[in-house]
Structures are given as structure tokens and as C-alpha cells.
Amino acid sequence: MRFYTWKDIERYILMHHDEWKDELYDIEVYPNEMVVYPKSEQGTLQNAVLKKLFPKNITPDNLSIKLDGQGEDLMILYEYEYSPVTVRTLPLFKKAIYEDSIYPTEQLADLSCPVFAFHSYKGGVGRTLSLIAFARAWTNLQKNPENSKLLIIDSDLEAPGLTLIQGDLNDSAFSYLDLLTLIQDNSNVEEIVSTAGNLMGTITLPIETSQQRVEHFFLPTYRYEEQLFDLYASPQTITASRNKEYILAEVLSKLASSLGATAVLVDLRAGISEYSAPLLLDPRVKKYCVTSTSLQSVMGTKQVLSFIAKGLKIKEDTLLPTVFLGMIPETFPRREKQEIKENLLGCFET
């Protein structure tokens, strides 16, 4: 591997954690230096570890690492005083990529109201339409739809679709970004839900069936454009906060319950996005992954499913993701459909 910047070195160290964890407590990498925390003061051990990691780049005196193509060095410092840091499990792609399991060891609290998240690797494959179709089917199955409403959330912070479909939003509405700000600034779930419930506007998302039209609760991405372009809080910043790793699904669930809704439907941001990760990587959330038959869409969906499957203990009640394969040409061979199915299911083989 070639190391063009300090960030390449940091990623490489995280990728090869198993190769140095027995001799070193930690390695911290910065733009101009790398700090090594040896478990022993025997220089030969720590030098051997670094030479094994960077055989072509470490200098003969073991005091720096040469960056490829720049002629610059990254100085190595050795620190023998080390205070252990508690490792946190974060439902974010940038953390999950280096972990054997993306799920916490402790049992998470059950959600009071089910949360369904709709995701796609690529845009334009029918993710939002799948959510609407799901909402229509849900409404159609209820004996009394007016008493079985949904809380539908547009959480796409880069290309909000449902929000734009709704047209002009009045300033008295309440948005997903408003909710994220409340969560960022407060750790008390009950207070967050109470405030959000009081601020919820009158905006609804109408779902029509063959029998009736039901106005479901709707949380748009934003209520004025400046919210969208001048972000303060996001799912990523909230998740990185102390003791808020899995708060998002809990707040959405409890907010739905407080409104009298029976379930939450969330339209996620497409792609490998940290805006979507906290719900995609929460084992309590039911995921629907939407893909077309294109190779790019299928391979991207497989990448997402591989993240979801990392360390997932499959039990009878495990919420495995469901894949919606759409936009299938009439002439698409059955054999190729089967190959796509086997390719995606392979992510969860034990």
C-alpha cells in the first residue's frame, strides 16, 4: 500500500490492529507526527512492530515514516504513559469498517413503536416510491386507518424528495432538522419527545387507497431552506456525542407513540452516507434496501448489506433487512435475477 498522506497511515494502522495490539497500547496519527504507546520499554519490540507494518517507509533510525511521492516524513514519538480509553461502538460506517462487529455488546432498550427505514445505494431506483407503496399497503390493511396512522419522515439531508413533493412549507411546521437540533442539545429523551410533540405542525402526507384518503403524520426534512444549507446537527454528530450512540431510533419511536402513530417510516439518504448509518446500523430498526438490476446498484447494495451483517447475531427475532429488486426489464433473464438474489443473500450466510 502506498502512503500519500498521514490519513493513509492512520487507516492502515486501524486495518492492521491485530498485528500490533499485543505489543502496543495504541497508535495515534496526526498530520505531522505519529504517537506510539508501547506496552514495554524494550525498544527492540516496538521497533520490530513498526518495521513489520511499514517495511518500505520507516527510516533506519525508527524515528520517522516517509510518505510516498512527497519526500516528507512523519515523525514518530514514543510515549510510555498511557491512560486507557473506553472503546465505544458507534453505528457509523467510518467506525464499522475497522470493527469485527458493529453492534453493542449490551442489550439495547426495545423500541416502543416499530421503525422502518428505506435505503438505496443509488438514487433513482424507487426508494421513495417503495416507501409510499408500503404506506399505502399498510393503510389498506388497517381496519380503522384513522386510528393506525404512520409517522413518515424525510431524513434525506442532501436530496429531500418527500419534502419537495409537499410543496411550500409554512414556518409553523416542525422539521426533521428541528428534531435533530433538539437531540443534539439535550440528552433527556422524554424532554426531547415532549418538546417535539408540542411543536409538531399540521403538515401531513396524504396516502390514498381504493377506499379512502388518510392524512399521515409527516416530518419534512426542513421548513425553510437555510436549515438545509446551514446544518447545525446531523445524525452523525449526534451519534458521535457521548451516550447518544443509539438515541435517534429511540426518539423517533417515542415521538410516534406520543402522536398516536403505530409505526415510523423513514426515507434515508442514498449511498454510503453517515446521515443514514445510525438507523441502518441499529439492530432494532427494520431495513428495506431498494435496488435496480444494474451492476452498480446491486454491488453497492451488497456493500451496504455487508456492513449490516457485520457481527449480527442471527436469531429467530432478528430484524434482517428486506431487499426490494425493482426496475426489472421485461426481458431480464430469470437466471440473472437468481444470481442477484444469491449474491445479496450471501452477505448473511453463517
Task: Specify the residue positions occupied by each region the protein language model found.
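Long, basic/Gly/Ser/Thr-rich N-terminal segments
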Residues: 1-96
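Conserved catalytic-core segment of NTP-binding enzymes
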Residues: 5, 44, 48-52, 246-349
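A short helix-to-beta-strand connector/capping loop
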Residues: 61, 205-218, 260, 316-319, ...
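Phosphate/oxyanion-binding active-site loops and adjacent basic polyanion-contact surfaces
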Residues: 89, 94, 126-127, 240-248, ...
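Pre-Walker A adenine-sensing motif
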Residues: 96-110
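Walker A/P-loop phosphate-binding motif and the immediately C-terminal alpha-helix
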Residues: 108-164
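Extended hydrophobic secondary-structure segments that form protein cores and membrane-embedded regions
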Residues: 116-118, 150-155, 218-220, 266-267, ...
